[in-house]
Amino acid sequence: MTWSATLALAGADGEPVDLWRTLMSHGVADLPPNRIDEEARTLETTVAVPRGRPQTVIVREERDGKAALSGTAGKRSEAVLDGMRHILRLDEDLSEFYALAADDPDLQWVTQGAGRLMRSQTVYEDVVKTICTTNTAWSGTVRMVSAIVEHLGEPAAGAPADSPFGRAFPSPAAMAAAPESFYRDVARSGYRGAYLRSLAQSVASEEIDLEELATADPDDLSDDEVAACLLALPGVGPYAAAHIMMLIGRYSRLVLDSWTRPTYASLNGRKAKDTAIERRFRRYGRYSGLAFWLFLTRDWVAEPV
C-alpha cells in the first residue's frame, strides 16, 4: 500500500520556502537515512513513527508552492507528516532574518526562500552525524553513518537488505546496546566509537536530554549555555558545537574552519581575520552564523537564468 500527501512550502509566518535549497543546504543532509537525488531533485528518507513501524518517504517539489510526499508502504499518518515538517523546518519563522537580508546586497537573494538548514528528526541524530564528520575525510563519515543506520536502524516495510536506506536512524537505546566491537570493526569509527557509545548510553538512560536544546526559549537557555552543554558531550569540540547549534536553530555563531575561511577569502577577494568576518555579519545578530553560511553556499544551487 502506498500513500501521497502535500505540504505547503511556507514558513511559520508565511514566508516562502525553496525546497531544493533546503535539501542542498549542507552536506550532512545527504547522510543516511537520507538520500538526495540531484537529477530527479528528490529526497528519500525514512522516519521513525511513535508506536509504529518506520516509513520511507519520497519528497519532491510541485509547481504550486507545495511539496509532494509519497510513502512507499504503510498508511498516511500525521506523525509522518509532522516529522517531515520538522525535517524541512516548515515550523520555523525566518521573516526577521529576511528583513535583515533584504537590506544586504550580497544576501538579498535569500529572501526568496533560502535559509532553512535541513535537520534530522532528533537532535541526537544530528549530534551523532556531526561527531562522525570530525577529523576524517567525507568518505569516512559516510562509511560510519551508513554502518550505524544499516546495522542498528529499524527497517521500514520493504527495506532492501544490506543497505542503510529504508531504515530509520537508530534510537539511543539501539546504539547503546551495540558492543564496542561494532564501532571498532563494523562502523570503523576509531576513537569516536567510545564517544558515540557513551553518548547513546547517557541519552538512553535520560541522564542527558538533547532534545530540550532545540526547544528551550533563548531567554531561558542562552546560546552560551547551549554551547556549554554541547561542549560537555563526548566527542564534541568547538567546530562540532557550532555546527550542531546551527542545526538546532541557534544561528548566532559562525562556523569558522578549514573550509569556511578560505571560501570566504575567495568570495571576498582577500583573506580576512576571524574578527573581520564576524564584524561583517554582526548586523544579523542572532542570525549571524546563518547569514555567513548562506554567503558561502549560494553557488551550491544553480540560479535561474
What is the predicted role of each segment?
Residues 1-305:
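HhH-family (HhH-GPD) DNA N-glycosylase catalytic core used in base-excision repair
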